[in-house]
A protein has these predicted regions:
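Basic, Lys/Arg-enriched alpha-helical interface segments
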Residues: 1-70, 79-83, 92-116
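Conserved catalytic cores of phosphodiester-cleaving nucleases, focusing on short active-site segments
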Residues: 86
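Residue-level signal for short, function-critical loop segments
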Residues: 89
Length: 116
C-alpha cells in the first residue's frame, strides 16, 4: 500500500493560506478537519464520498461538516504519494464555487512549476 504525505501548499514567500484557513476554524471544525486529514493521509486516492469527492481535472475536495457548518479543503495528488492541500473555504452554496476550483488549479500549476 502506498504511503501518503499531506502537504499544505506554500506561496513563494512561505505563507500557507490553506494552513491559515484550517487554523482559523473553530475548535470543533478544526478537530474534525484534522481527523479527516489523517484519514486522507492513510487512505489517499482510495478515499471516497462522503469524505472526499473529485471535482474537476484532478482537483478533489475534503468534505467536513459540523452541525450546519460545512467546510471544504481542496487538494491534488502529486508524485510519490504527496497530497497537496491548496485552499479551503466555508461552503454556503450547493455547488463548489468555480473560483475556488480555479484557485486550486492555479496553486497546483504554481506548485508544479516550482517543485518540478
Amino acid at each position: 500500500m502506498t504511503e501518503f504525505t499531506v502537504i499544505a501548499y506554500e506561496k513563494e514567500d512561505g505563507e500557507s493560506p490553506v494552513e491559515d484557513f484550517i487554523n482559523a476554524l473553530d475548535v470543533k471544525m478544526k478537530a474534525k478537519m484534522y481527523g479527516l486529514l489523517s484519514i486522507l493521509q492513510e487512505k489517499g486516492n482510495i478515499l471516497r464520498e462522503p469524505y472526499s469527492k473529485h471535482l474537476d481535472d484532478g482537483i478533489f475536495e475534503l468534505r467536513c461538516k459540523v452541525g450546519n457548518n460545512i467546510t471544504r479543503v481542496l487538494y491534488f495528488f502529486y508524485y510519490e504519494g504527496k497530497i497537496i492541500l491548496t485552499n479551503g473555504f466555508v461552503k454556503k452554496t450547493q455547488k463548489t464555487p468555480p473560483e475556488e476550483i480555479r484557485l486550486a488549479k492555479e496553486r497546483r500549476a504554481d506548485y508544479i512549476e516550482r517543485m518540478g
